[in-house]
């Protein structure tokens, strides 16, 4: 792995990110070889990813390095079923409130 890397959004988490990135790069190089047994593949970096992710999420809960609405990003870019359900529920609630106020 080269010395060049993308830093974490939070400097306190950078070391964890570099450890995870190194692990994933090594794993991925094996994963793409023709002889790798994909059906038995276990992600050896999952625990490292979880630790790094927790570090970032803890800081995001208290710090906002950018003016970003994470919920809006999740909705617009991930567009999960959960997001769609919340939208439907919010629309139904808004419609119900509008009907009550116009009566």
Swiss-Prot record:
Signal peptide range: none
Disulphide linkage map: 13-55, 23-45
Compositional bias segments (type: Polar residues): 91-103
Region (Disordered) residue spans: 80-103
Residue ranges of the TM segments: none
Keyword Disulfide bond (UniProt): yes
Cross-referenced Pfam families: UPF0203
Highest taxon above the source species: Eukaryota
Keyword Disulfide bond part of the UniProt annotation: yes
Assigned protein family: Belongs to the TRIAP1/MDM35 family.
Protein name: Uncharacterized protein mdmh-35
Organism: Caenorhabditis elegans
